[in-house]
Amino acid sequence: MGKTIVEKIFDAHRVEELPGGTHVLRLDAVFAHEVTTPVAINELVSLGKDRVFDASKIKAVIDHVTPAKDSKTAEQGKVLRDWARRNNIEDFFDIGRNGVCHALFPEKGFVRPGSTIIMGDSHTCTHGAFGAFAAGVGTTDLEVGILKGVCAFKTPLSMKFNITGSFRKGVFAKDLILSIIGKIGVNGATNRIMEFTGELIDSLSMDSRMTLCNMAVEAGATSGVCYPDMTTVNYLWPFIQDAYASKEAALADYSKLVSDPDSVYDAVIDVDASDIEPLTTFDYKPDNIKTVREMSGVRVDQVYIGSCTNGRIEDLREAAAVLEGYEIAAHVRGILSPATPAIFRQALDEGLIAVFMDAGFVVTNPTCGACLGMSNGVLAEGEVAASTTNRNFNGRMGKGGMVHLMSPATAAATAVAGHIASSPFFEG
C-alpha cells in the first residue's frame, strides 16, 4: 500500500509511536508570535524551564498588534522579546523588521519541503504549500515543542482534491478555496490533511498555493499540502542554492515528496476550476458561500486587503489592476496592509502603493490588526466589511460587525462600487 506525502513526512520524523495511533515527531521548526506564545513562555518560566531545544529552529515575530495599541499588547510583545533575548533566538523580528508570520517566515526561507513545523496559530497550515507538514497547536503542545523539539500527532488521514480546468476572469485561488469549503462544510475535513493536486494547482504561484493551504483549517483540517515542484524550487532557490548543484537537482530531491499512486484517501474530490465564479461569504460561517453575482448590491462600509491569506505581492497586484484609474466610493473606508516589509517595498517599487493611495486607501504597516479585530480597522456594531482575510465569525473584526470574505480583486471592485461588486465589473 502506498503512502501519502504527509505519511512520508511522518515516517521521516517519527521518534516514537504511542498506543492509539499517536506519533511523536521531531520538529524542524517552532514558529512563535506575541499573542499565543507568551502564555507558553510564562508557564515554562513558572516551572523553571526557561530554555529552548534549539535556538536556531525557533522563529519569532511580533505581528498581531504592532506597534502595540495598549498596555496589554505591549506586555505581550515584551514577554516574547525578552524570551527571545534570554534564549539567544537570532531569528526574532521586532518592529521595523516584522511582518505577518505566515507571509514573513516563508519569505525568509524558513519553510522547506518535507519539514515539520508547529505554531500556536491555527493558520500554520499555510506552510503546507511548500510540501511541509505544518500545524497549529495548543499551549501544552507548544510548550513541549519549545522545550524538547517534538510534538505528538494522530495518524494522518488525507482528503485529495484533484483540481482541473482553469480560472475564468476575476477568479483566483481565494475563490477556489471558498468553493471547496462551501462544498464540504466547516467540518468537512476535520482532523484530515487537505491535499491539493491537479493541473490547476501545478499552474499556481506559491502565493496562490499559500492562500489555498491557509484556509484549510476553515474546513476543520489539521493542515493543507501541495506537492513541491519547480515553482517551489524557484521560490526557495536563494535559500537552498548552496545545498544543490542546480535547480534540477533540488527538484529531483523534492520530487520524492508526492503521494504514491496507490495511496489510501479518506475521500477523493474532483473540482473543475472552470466552473467557479467569483465568490464571497454571507452570514457568520466560512462555508456559507454565494457568488458575487448573487450578493451584488450588498452595501459595505469598509474594504480590507491584507492578512496571511491575501496580503502578498500577487494579491496587491490583482487588486491594483482593478483599482487603477478609479476612486473608492465616498462612504467606503479602504485599508491596505501589505503582509511584510519586503512586500511593502516591492509594491512601492512597482507603483502599486500609489494606485491604492490614489484610489483612496490608507496603507498601514505590516500587521494582522484588523483581521481579528485587534487594531487598524476594527468595525463598529452594525458595520459591514469586505475582507480578504480568512474568517467571518460573528464579531471577528469587531463586535456586531459583518465580514464578507473574498479575493483581493473582488474586494477592490467592491471598494469602487461601494457594494459587493458583481463579476461584470471585471469586464468593464
Give, region by region, the residue ranges found by the protein language model.
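Fe-S-dependent hydro-lyases/dehydratases of central metabolism
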Residues: M1-G428
